[in-house]
Amino acid sequence: IDSINNIDTLIDEKGAKSEQDIVGRVYEYFLGKFAATEGKGGGEFYTPKCVVNLLAEMIEPYHGKIYDPCCGSGGMFVQSVQFVESHKGNKKDISIYGQEQTTTTYKLAKMNLAIRGIAANFGDVPADTFFKDQHPDLKADFIMANPPFNLKAWRGPDELTNDPRWAGYEVPPTGNANYAWILHMVSKLSESGVAGFVLANGAMSTNTKGEGEIRKKLIENDLVDCMIALPGQLFYTTQIPVCLWFLTKNKKAETIPGHSDSNHRNRQG
C-alpha cells in the first residue's frame, strides 16, 4: 500500500487521468520494482523509461507500423502510444507488432498493453525471433528494440548460415547475436522505415568474426543515421555503458513516416 501511494496518479494540468492510465502507471511502477529486485533476470524484460523516451523522441512514431522483435514487457509500445497522444495524435494511427520468446514475459507484455486499451499483435505464441518469426511478412515503418546484450550461443554452428536476412552481409557469429539483431531489424524495415535500438557500446567498434565487415557494409549501404553513447549504470542487467543506434532505410526519400524533411535533415546533421 505504501508503494502504491508513491505512484504519480494525481490530476495534472491537462485534466484528470483516465482509469486506464492510472492502472497502467501502477503496472509500470511494479514492473520497474520487480526488475530492480530481480536484477539480471528482471532486466531481461524491462528497459528504463528514460531510454525508451529518448528512442521515441528520436524516431517520432506518429503513425504506421511499429515493431519490436524482442519486446519484453512492451514498454517500447506504451511509450510510442504516449508519444503520439502527447503530440495530439491518435493511437489508432499506429499498428503494433511484437515478439517475445519467454512465456512469462510474453504474458506481461500482453497484459501491459491490454490494461491500457492498446491493440497489439504479439504473434500466436512466445517464440524465438531468429528461428520462428511470428511476423514473416511484416515491413515496419518504425522499429524500437532493446535486444539482450551480447547474447551467446543464439544459433548452432550450422544453423541459419544461409538465412535471407544476412543476404549481402557476413553471417553473424554464433558467439554474439548483436549483429544478428541488427540485420533482422534491417530486413523488417519498410522502404522508408526508421529503427532505433539499444546495444552494448562494444557493438560500435567490434571487429570479431565478421562483425566489423557487417558494420562497414551497413555504413556503405547508407543505413546508419547516427549512434549515441549513453552512460553506464542505466540498466539492471549490466553496469557497462550502452549506445543507441538509429538506422534509416532510405535517407533520400522526400518523406519518412512521422518525420518532416527539416527534422530528418537535422537528425543527420
Where are the language model's segments positioned?
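Flexible, glycine-/basic-rich loop-and-beta segments that form/coincide
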Residues: 235-269
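Conserved S-adenosyl-L-methionine
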Residues: 41-145, 150-160, 165-168, 180, 223-232, ...
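Glycine-rich S-adenosyl-L-methionine
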Residues: 164-189
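Long recognition/docking surfaces used for binding and targeting
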Residues: 1-35
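Short glycine-dipeptide loop
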Residues: 62-63, 189-195
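Conserved phosphate/pyrophosphate-binding and hydrolysis machinery centered on Walker-type P-loop NTPases
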Residues: 16-24, 41-49, 175
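Active-site lining segments that contact anionic ligands and/or coordinate catalytic metals
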Residues: 139-140, 176-178, 192-200, 224-225, ...
